[in-house]
Amino acid sequence: TTKDGLTGNYVRAIYEDRSGTFWIGTYDEGMSRFKDGKFVNYKETDGLYNSGVFAIEEDAAGFFWISSNRGIYRVNRTELEDFAAGTIKRINSVGYGKEDGMLSTECNGGRQPASFRADDGKFWFPTQDGIAVVDPLSERSNPMPPTVVIEDMSVERSPVDFRNGIKIEAGKKDIEIRYTGISLIKSEQIKFQYKLDG
């Protein structure tokens, strides 16, 4: 229960990986890892695509495929372990929905089994509008970070030309920079990091 450290009491999935670690999914409170008698919890605020975890399947490359009310999402088990060890602060997950061919993003998970691994390695997940079949071998990833493009910039709500470099006087406030990333794969899920220097 939550008194013992579990992320939520409404458990929807329990998966034991090949090392004997238990991964426990909840209705809407995220996922817990149970290892060596201790819980580590993962939520949307930590990088999960959704806090619903109805079923967990693992592919040969070490990725978890998880069904939820927002579709199916994929997360690297190694990243989950690194997060638990404190070596990273955020998990990367990729969501799949109607734009990827699902008829409904609302997966079913109130009963077991909420997923099925076929002999060909594909995963079957029940949804409100039929079955969603995932082939992990057909997953296309983009190993190169997308090119970041600065679209415009303003200082104290006035547009400034930044193309040849810019110096901002001391005391100026409200600096806004609009930027985007260019990618043809899952562009709506690009995550940015930034750092102010100086």
For the regions a language model picked out, list residue spans one by one.
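Residue-level "micro-hotspots" composed of small/polar
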Residues: 3-15, 27, 40, 44-198
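Surface-exposed extracellular loop regions of Gram-negative outer-membrane beta-barrel proteins
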Residues: 30-35
